[in-house]
Amino acid sequence: TLFVYVENPVEEKEKLRLKTLLKEGRHEVTSRLDVPLYKRDGYKIPEDEVLLKNPNKVYLGNSLYHNIRYTYQYRNRLFWGFTAEKDAGEPFGSYGNKAYDAYSFHFLLKDCGKLKTLALGDYRLGFGEGLVVNSDFSLGKSTLFNMGDTRPSIKKFSSTSETSFFRGIAAAFRFGRVDMSAFYSYLPTDATLRKDGTISSLKTDGLHRTLLELSKKHNVTEQSVGTDVTWNTEYFSLGAIVFYQHFSRSFSKGTELYRQYYPDEKDFLNAGLHYRWHRDRFSFSGETAFSNMYGGWATLNKAIYRFNHRYSMVALQRLFTYQYVGLRANSFSEGGAVRNESGFYTGVEASPLNELKLSAYVDYFYFPWAKFGIPHTSEGVEGTFQVDWVVSGKWELSGRYQLKRKERYGQPY
């Protein structure tokens, strides 16, 4: 009897050796220098009387922007590097800065036995649909068709951005069908403080050009710890995440109506379930999360059906209660935050010809609680139609029509 048996080959990961890393790794150094061709008001020295009344009218540093980045990469298994940056107007080597204003270091190791990922220094996280933790990039309304695998991810952070990352250690392990991730972060951050020393809001622009902006630099520390466990099969995955944050100062929500359900403590706890099922042309994924403050919750679910390689359809539902608080949440939304929003999105994509692609979507959104400038519930709708035509190998034409209507104070949309 003669028979043939075929199976996927077992890939053996090579051992990482110092000699190999030094010889075959890729080193890269890049730098950027921006020289403005005009003089902004912040660099003009005002009269002494004006300067005494408002010292924040003058930038403390020169008008040059500069950064330098070093990165090392060995295949897709080992990465490390650092970044140093000075924004235009920030002091260099003075006012407490050790040369540059901001520094960042990252180290990432992948695929060493059961250890899938190890990150040290600065890193990014993504779990589920981002309702609990997501410091990675979120999809826009026109890119939902391109969404890939939503498995938990730990990635290196090598950007010049001074927000949307964690600093510490993170690790992911795989035991058969179970993925386990754990992380800890200690991160100094910027904040605007009230007179009593509580946090009014977190400052995210990373600019420290004036005395006022410097006074907000790293005046708060954020400690974060969390874990995620995900069970995977060929067609289905189910995961649970728990995330805890502690700030060195308490938040203060203020007295404004729209801020009534804003953060008002220094400790925050979030937990969520994320799930995904895919089979042939259909895929469904989502997440449901809860927060300890105000008892809020949030859920987001989306489905994609591909009729064939030319036609596909997507639908997305979201419901974020106004009591939900997720300071590290980042997901699909109209209002830019995972709170006080519900809505339904549907879109289609068609390629009747190889050179032609048509896409359209409609998104309806509703805000059940007051927003800044709108002291009542509000709603809106957005629709887009786009045509992409590949004329030749060198030319591509695109056209887009977009309609968006949002309710304003005292005016229906």
Question: Where in the sequence are the language-model features?
Answer:
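Alpha-helical interaction/regulatory segments in DNA maintenance proteins
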Residues: 2-26, 127, 312-315
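Transmembrane beta-strand segments of Gram-negative outer membrane beta-barrel proteins
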Residues: 18-54, 72, 76-82, 118, ...
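Short loop/turn motifs that connect adjacent beta-strands in outer-membrane beta-barrel proteins
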Residues: 20-26, 76-77, 109-118, 127, ...
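Outer-membrane beta-barrel translocator/receptor signature
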Residues: 39, 46-52, 56-68, 72-80, ...
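Outer-membrane beta-barrel and related beta-rich outer-membrane complex signature
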Residues: 43, 130-134, 187-200, 250-254, ...
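Outer membrane beta-barrel
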Residues: 96-190, 312-325
